[in-house]
Regions:
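Long, intrinsically disordered, low-complexity tracts enriched in Ser/Thr with interspersed Pro
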Residues: 6-10
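Short glycine-rich His-centered loop
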Residues: 14-23
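Post-kinase regulatory C-tail/linker adjacent to protein kinase catalytic domains
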Residues: 263-273
Length: 348
């Protein structure tokens, strides 16, 4: 699999990448100076425990079945949010005789050749997978619960439908609008659960409805500020978000930025979550920071840490890509030019 990234090179913050937009191989081939010497590979973190109420951390790791103990002043959890598939309960799934796959395990489309495929979920992964499968499948049902059909210029082989109500037979799927379709494959593009099995109970981290709590600014554990979570925000430019979060955390560790008291951070975390829920948004979307929320978040961190603001051309690139993604399946083929004055021009 070598999916092309949906982000432009200029907002990936990786200057050596030349492909626009880069694929999986180009991204994997990036090497940051010094990382191979300092990183320990093929090692699994077994447990992380706070010592002296978070003043230091006991970390147990497993390498070649040998568990060793290390102690650190701080811990950054950078495990991402795409490792534990969320598999929704589907009534009658035990009667289904076709194949079921989660997007986490998707690699190539060749096994779907000539098949009728139901893709459940129309987020970025669901759409990308449906488009790739559509090049070889007989029919693709893109099923979702969004209030309106997506306005993309999908190829004729892709048919938008409601979500799944139940499975009625070997390959018979009943949709929520009562329509019946036959599918030999079901591909679940239903997201992921946030799990941190390596964090001990003493870390006092909860993940109810995929909200990591209690975190200050989506980064700092309010009780243990030397424990940070990097990369939780969704619907963002991930590399820029993670860069600013890293700088914020390191500034706090170095002492150039002073954090509020633990109690104040905990109160702020609870207040932010309550505000999110009271506004009518789903609790599970607390870490979503679309567009203006993202820019405000980055500006807040920049002001606190004295960092440069996000350049305007990056915001323009994000807006252009988002707009084209909404209506065009080939948005990744867009050609971008940034003029000397910072103006962004694009064409296909």
């Amino acid at each position: 699999m070598n999916w092309r990234n949906s982000s432009r090179k200029k907002i990936l913050m990786t200057p050596k990448i030349t492909a626009l937009p880069p694929g999986k191989i180009e991204i994997q081939n990036q090497r940051i100076g010094g990382l191979p010497l300092s990183a320990q590979y093929n090692t699994r973190v077994v447990e992380v425990k706070p010592v002296f109420d978070g003043q230091s951390w006991d970390v147990y790791v497993e390498d070649a079945k040998i568990i060793s103990h290390h102690q650190f002043d701080a811990v950054m959890v950078c495990t991402g949010r795409y490792s534990t598939p969320m598999v929704p309960p589907i009534l009658g799934i035990e009667r289904y005789k076709g194949h079921v796959m989660h997007s986490h395990n998707y690699r190539t489309a060749h096994c779907f050749t000539g098949e009728a495929v139901l893709v459940l979920g129309a987020g970025p992964s669901g759409i990308d997978i449906a488009l790739e499968i559509a090049t070889v499948a007989e029919r693709v049902y893109l099923c979702h619960d969004q209030p309106k059909p997506l306005t993309k210029d999908f190829p004729p082989v892709i048919c938008q439908e409601n979500g799944i109500l139940r499975i009625d037979g070997d390959h018979t799927v009943v949709l929520k609008n009562g329509k019946i379709v036959s599918a030999t494959w079901i591909v679940l593009c239903t997201g992921y659960n946030l799990t941190y099995g390596f964090l001990s109970e003493g870390c006092r981290v909860t993940t109810d409805e995929n909200v990591v709590f209690p975190l200050y600014k989506h980064i700092f554990h309010a009780d243990f500020p030397s424990l940070a979570f990097i990369g939780l925000p969704m619907r963002v430019i991930p590399f820029i978000i993670m860069d600013y979060q890293n700088r914020f955390f390191l500034s706090a560790l170095e002492g150039s930025v002073k954090l509020p008291s633990c109690e104040a951070m905990k109160q702020q975390a609870a207040k932010d979550l309550a505000k999110h829920v009271s506004s009518g948004l789903a609790k599970r979307h607390f870490h979503c920071l679309p567009k203006m929320k993202m820019w405000n978040y980055l500006e807040d961190i920049a002001n606190i840490c004295g960092l440069p603001k996000v350049p305007q051309y990056v915001k323009d690139l994000y807006d252009i890509t988002s707009k084209e993604r909404e209506c065009k399946c080939q948005y990744k083929d867009i050609k971008i030019r940034i003029l000397p004055d910072g103006t962004v021009r694009y064409s296909y």
